[in-house]
Amino acid sequence: FFFLGIIIISLIFLPSFFLPKSIVLIGGKLMGYWSKFCLRIFLSTKIIIKGVENIIKDDKFFIACSHQSMFETFYLQTIFNSPVFILKKELLSIPIFGWYLKKIGSISIKRNKISRDNLSFFNDISNTVMSTDRPLIIFPQGTRVLPNDKPDFKKGVFRIYQELKISCQPVAINSGHVWPKKGLKQSNKNITVSILKQIPSGLSQEEFTKTLQNSIYSELDLLD
């Protein structure tokens, strides 16, 4: 039922692909609200948001978020200003959904391949961030993980932090207990979106990575 709604929203906004990007972005926010509605109605799940006061204002920043389910890819669009996503290039080939991702300015990369496209990847990120007031969002774990998994963050996260020279907004979400990577969805549990204090620019690789990883994993331990 959830994915049927996503398809319907995509079809409704299909004509908007020929309109300004701002119109298409409304469809993304609707998908976020739709996911909240479905979780509440079918799984009796409430969405709790903590740390709204920590959201960086009047300055450029990028979001580094834990990744346990598809929930965050939809719902974070309702909290932040339509974030720019970094995603696998293959996703752009999906009919309608891939067109939507391309239209809203998502940045794609070919995983585990050295190519001319990948060599310009960080330039694309920098140019995109500097030309818009929408924050970039990345998932430093690299892929969806199970709630109790705590892999080291990918090194590319620091490279982005280093290249952009802007603050990082850490976000921890315990969505995997309700909408897991594997298995059935669980009912009567809450999902907490915890917006953590910003990490300022200018830190060393070791200091930044340690601060980011500790802040997100420590918060997830508290949420669990």
Regions from the language model: what does each represent?
Residues F42-K50, N118-S120, N174-G176:
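Short gly/ser/thr-rich secondary-structure transition/capping motifs
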Residues F1-K21, I26-K29, E53-I56, T128, ...:
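Membrane-interfacial terminal anchoring regions of lipid-handling membrane enzymes
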